[in-house]
Amino acid sequence: AARFMDNVIDAARWPLEKLEKAVKRTRKIGIGVMGWAHMLIKLGIPYDSVDAVYLAYYLAEWIEYNLALASIGLAREKGPFPAYDPERYRPTWRTARPLEELLSVAGVSSKPSEKVVRILSGRPRVDWGTVDKLLGLYGIRNAALTSIAPTGTISIIAGTSSSIEPIFAVAFERHVTVGSFIEVDRIFLEELRKLELDEPAVIAKIAELGSIAHFPFVPKRLRRLFRTAHDIEPSWHVLHQAAWQQWVCAGVSKTVNMRAEASVGDVWRVYMLAWKLGCKGITVYRDRSKSRQVIYVGVKASRKRVDHMRKEREDQDSRKPAESMRTTHRDLAAESRGEISRLGEGAVQELAEALGDAKDCKTCEY
């Protein structure tokens, strides 16, 4: 994979000479993953568990380790990237934080199960000391090796879950330019067939809500495994991203899906946790925070939203546009001020102490 991606840099046609020079100066590649949630389900491991975070951390390390060896091998064969400076280059294996530290920051004290310990014990050993020695001898071909992309489209083509995201819903309605259609998670359907529960009436009932968290007729094991993006607490979303981020050179595309009733304070806490855990970026999406969105959880919610939008449009047509806009902005501003004030002075003080002054930035070396 590293050789293929490195060759793409030379084979590609660049629209601007300036762009080509910039890319070839660092020769960054971005190998990532998808299908993470489906893999966990196949292993019988819930997404929102310490077991899943342990697997994420050590699988990410294994991927980075092999890519580092491959890129150093390419440097030995073809030379390191032109901008390589051994004094300034800081690889992930020198900056990655221990998993136990991440869990401690997030307030998680559980240990992995024997099952996961057994899985991890079968992973070949990594030797970062040897990698460092080889790096000193030959340099490295690519300034960046890994990047986890959203994989929204290619995961649909591959029939698997996207990126490192949990499944969005066991059934949902997707809206695209050519129309809308209902999707049911492929692996979930397979599990229903095993239990002889794949009756149209059962699937239709589940599709109404998109989640099986509160369906007593579905076995508890499945309810625990098929936890959807909105069933999972935000802290587990952030922990997954942080676990992968330690061994990913560039950014990690990950959305923290929050329920419609999430407050400004809830969002603030997610951003702070992501920063403390060393995530390079974070995305939060509160359900139904936009008048239109690509995916709605469950068919029932989707149709209800469409009806609400239709009624809202009719109401707006009956009012003066300027008056409608003024009211909306005033209400939104008042709501935001109220939420921020409820965070209290303690939260603001915590942020100020963590960030320090502009001349004393604690998040970078400058």
Labelled PLM ranges:
Residues 68, 358-361:
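Residues immediately within or flanking Cys/His clusters that coordinate Zn2+
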